[in-house]
Amino acid sequence: MTYLLIAALACERLTTVAVPHAVVTSAQSVAAGALAEFNTLPALCRVAATLTPSPDSDIKMELWLPAANWNGKFQEVGNGAFSGSIALPAMAAAVRRGYAAASTDTGHTGNTAGFALGHPEKVIDFGWRAVHETAVAS
């Protein structure tokens, strides 16, 4: 077996990993250049998960793991202001440099603060917990 095939098999098995307050929703091997919007990426393992550290939490995250030439480092990338989206372009830049990269939607979608009204736990998710939980789950 080649290294990339072994890495692909290991990637698919990440859906069975038990992570506190998390459900791994997908883990798929992505061939080099296969993501249309990021066609210069090397082969990677793309993992998606939902984190629920509180009953009101609904934090989405992705983790991209280089299939080869990992530099041994992890980089979590952020998003700006009230942005509730996973920062895929920043993750792609990190993976191109050999990093394992992760990002979170900070527990909401969209770019307004409406998610926070009447949801103090979501404010905590946005303020710090989503980033922390993403790093821990990664």
Predicted regions and their residues:
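Catalytic-loop region of hydrolases
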Residues: 6-73, 77, 89
